[in-house]
């Protein structure tokens, strides 16, 4: 079926927090919960993304809209290993941009400077350590800044 999805150009988006919160609610024991393992579908050419659309509402009564957190939650629940972490970050950045046909996506001269700077060294670290956003830019203008945590000796 995965090859058919890829061949038809069908993209798949998973909402990890909502899926986990809503699944199994109809049972009184053996609450089966999970998410579609879309990181495995990437290998067959399916464009997959991770997102959240239900925050602080009846479908998901918690959350902070962090897509890095969704990538981390997905990696945990779908048993994605360290070699998949980069793909998990892609599924909240470049892959949704492709799904939305954002041709001007990416960091290159002449493209809109819309980006978030994370406190990490690698894409894998962003997902595994829930990297904190330090700066955000929209159209080349800083839209927010956040100081990095400083640890002091006791």
Describe the residue ranges of each PLM region.
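C-terminal cap of metal-dependent C-N hydrolases
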Residues: 109-154
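Short glycine-enriched, charge-decorated loop/helix-capping segments at active-site entrances
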Residues: 26-29
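Acidic (Asp/Glu)-rich catalytic clusters
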Residues: 2-9
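Acidic, amphipathic alpha-helical patches
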Residues: 1-2, 106
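His/Asp/Glu-enriched, well-ordered alpha-helical/loop segment
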Residues: 14-23, 33-118
């Amino acid at each position: 079926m995965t090859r058919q999805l890829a061949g038809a150009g069908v993209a798949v988006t998973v909402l990890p927090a909502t899926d986990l919160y809503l699944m199994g609610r109809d049972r009184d024991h053996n609450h089966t919960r999970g998410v579609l393992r879309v990181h495995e579908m990437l290998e067959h050419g399916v464009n997959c993304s991770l997102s959240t659309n239900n925050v602080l509402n009846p479908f998901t009564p918690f959350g902070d809209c962090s897509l890095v957190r969704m990538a981390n939650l997905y990696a945990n629940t779908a048993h994605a290993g360290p070699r998949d972490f980069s793909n998990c970050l892609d599924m909240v950045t470049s892959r949704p941009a492709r799904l939305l046909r954002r041709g001007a996506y990416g960091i290159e001269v002449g493209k809109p400077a819309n980006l978030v700077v994370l406190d990490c060294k690698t894409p894998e670290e962003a997902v595994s350590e829930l990297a904190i956003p330090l700066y955000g830019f929209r159209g080349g203008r800083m839209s927010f800044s956040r100081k990095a945590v400083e640890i002091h000796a006791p």
